[in-house]
Amino acid sequence: MKAVRKMADIRQYKLSDKADLQNICVETTLFPKTEKVRKWLPIAFNDYYTEKQSEFVFVCANDLDKAVGYVLCAPDEKKFRQTMFDEYLPKIRKISFLAYTLLKREFSTIDKLYEKYPAHLHIDILPDYQRMGLGGKLIDALIEKLKEEKIIGVKLFCSANNKKGLSFYRKYGFTELGKQGGSVIFGYELGEND
């Protein structure tokens, strides 16, 4: 039986974490874990952040310093979307035209929330490390960084079927801003940072 490592600390991302973060991205997805999904999913939902905005990436690492969860953030949605179109979507297209088509549509418009919530985040934690308070600690670390950088708000999308996630974001203080597709959009205001 595999021993579960339950201790975890929050720290800044380092380059040696990249493969672990890609694995967490795949292991925590609701998509079927096919070979194609394992290839394009980290490109779509992980690589931009670790390659272009790593100062906005925090991990929870177990007692062996192996990443078991993360929060990723793009502090500027417009810059994120442009880079996705220029660099990452072409890579995804070579792997899966269907994924490319869906993501292209998702990334093609800047929503009306941009002015108030210019940043967005993704958070994933391996199941064995969930419900331990690590999600809140990851978001705390990110919020502190966003405030330092004078970012006024951050948003995220959570599946409407993810009851634990919905509860977590509400308890943390995120405000429900609306719905899009099968997701609930949450926002967190950091205040005016002049």
Residue ranges of predicted features:
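Conserved acyl-donor/pantetheine-binding loop and adjacent beta-alpha core of acyl/acetyltransferases
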Residues: 77-122
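C-terminal "cap" of GNAT-fold acetyltransferases
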Residues: 152-163, 171-173, 177-194
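A short beta-loop-alpha structural element at the N-terminal edge
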Residues: 8-23, 75
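Conserved beta-strand in the GNAT
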Residues: 59, 66-75
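Conserved GNAT acetyl-CoA-binding A-motif
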Residues: 117-119, 146-158
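Active-site rim helix/loop that mediates acceptor-substrate recognition in acyltransferases
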Residues: 36-57
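Residue-level recognition of the GNAT/N-acetyltransferase active site
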Residues: 122, 126, 159
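Conserved acetyl-CoA-binding loop-helix of GNAT-fold acetyltransferases
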Residues: 122, 131-145, 167, 171
